[in-house]
Amino acid sequence: MKTTYVNATIVTMNEQNEVIENGYIIVENDQIIDVKSGEFANDFEVDEVIDMKGKWVLPGLVNTHTHVVMSLLRGIGDDMLLQPWLETRIWPLESQFTPELAVASTELGLLEMVKSGTTSFSDMFNPIGVDQDAIMETVSRSGMRAAVSRTLFSFGTKDDEKKAIEEAEKYVKRYYNESDMLTTMVAPHSPYTCSTELLEECARIAVENQTMVHIHLSETEREVRDIEAQYGKRPVEYAASCGLFKRPTVIAHGVVLNDDERAFLAEHDVRVAHNPNSNLKLGSGIANVKAMLEAGIKVGIATDSVASNNNLDMFEEMRIATLLQKGIHQDATALPVETALSLATKGAAEVIGMKQTGSLEAGKCADFITIDPSNKPHLQPADEVLSHLVYAASGKDISDVIINGKHVVWNGECKTLDEERIIFEASRYKRGLQR
């Protein structure tokens, strides 16, 4: 099936960050086969021509660190620091999860993400009370592209830890490269919730299965102090000593890094998922993204969970990410719009190992989103497209979402998830949680 999308302003995010003011995209099944400017002549004998009527078309957004199973916890535990937030709010509530509640929570997060323009994401979920196969089936049904990872902790006894490792290894073997749309990573939660033995086992699983690693690391000053006091090393050095960086690794946060650590991470292909809103809300600090990029670290923007954000709007994350770098460096040129967009599209895709998406070019997966600026005063005058996408747009502006060539959202309506049912069930299950 060949489809051509015509009369579009196309933000390609190719190597030149080219914006085509009047162009078209030809899609064959799940792949882009051509992106060109000008009027479309049906030389390709396409099956369908869809008039975009001047809409902006850009690559689907890529969220590099999420916890969609936590979506029912929005608004619980506001105005708290990370450690008490986890220990007194999040973990006690997660211990009450059932398989049905976990699916309802996941659906809510998926619906929010896809309707606001996210097409791919990398996720970590706490397996307590969760049917992992049901979660993966739910993500698959949404039509989104994802790496969904089972989180490991060293809670409980040594036998509990051994069982957690065994279950995680089975999960990795089951779902790594499950399909072109769905995969997983090895996901120890953090150095402060995992023993040395568990981290070493995670490194082994990643090496033996050739998977990536996803971990929270260097998120707060307290974490750095505690790990240094316990192990005599800062978190980066400690994680490296456990073997985690033998495989490409995504660290969520990286707020507290020094120059030597940034150089080390770049050398060992350790990527950073930057969560600006979450880091601000939890009082964790501001990651020095400018210094990361200058050191050669791959960086992708992320939202974290709705419990610490409190939304999954990647446009908002782009805007706050660039404004923060300008502010902390007192440099208005820091993180310009092209870079901010890259960190939410092609750069983010590279961070989580999904190079097949993130830009609109021949050979890439047909993952793209659209915005109609014609009826939106905040996007007018409409000629400064890149600026408006970073500084003025929001997830609420999304019209259409195409993932792998399929219309997942069209004219604002999600075709893969039942919005009315999901919102009803989210409220019902939330009422059952005991705070």
Curated annotation (Swiss-Prot):
GO molecular function: 5'-methylthioadenosine deaminase activity; adenosine deaminase activity; metal ion binding; S-adenosylhomocysteine deaminase activity
E.C. numbers: 3.5.4.28, 3.5.4.31
Keywords: Hydrolase, Metal-binding, Zinc
Bilayer-spanning residue ranges: none
UniProt entry tagged with the keyword Zinc: yes
Entry keyword annotation includes Kinase: no
Binding site for substrate: E94, R150, H189, E219, D304
Family of the protein in this entry: Belongs to the metallo-dependent hydrolases superfamily. MTA/SAH deaminase family.
PANTHER family attached to this UniProt entry: AMIDOHYDROLASE-RELATED DOMAIN-CONTAINING PROTEIN, AMINOHYDROLASE SSNA-RELATED
Function: Catalyzes the deamination of 5-methylthioadenosine and S-adenosyl-L-homocysteine into 5-methylthioinosine and S-inosyl-L-homocysteine, respectively. Is also able to deaminate adenosine.
Identification of the protein by name: 5-methylthioadenosine/S-adenosylhomocysteine deaminase
Organism of derivation: Bacillus cereus (strain ATCC 14579 / DSM 31 / CCUG 7414 / JCM 2152 / NBRC 15305 / NCIMB 9373 / NCTC 2599 / NRRL B-3711)
Species classification: Bacteria, Bacillati, Bacillota, Bacilli, Bacillales
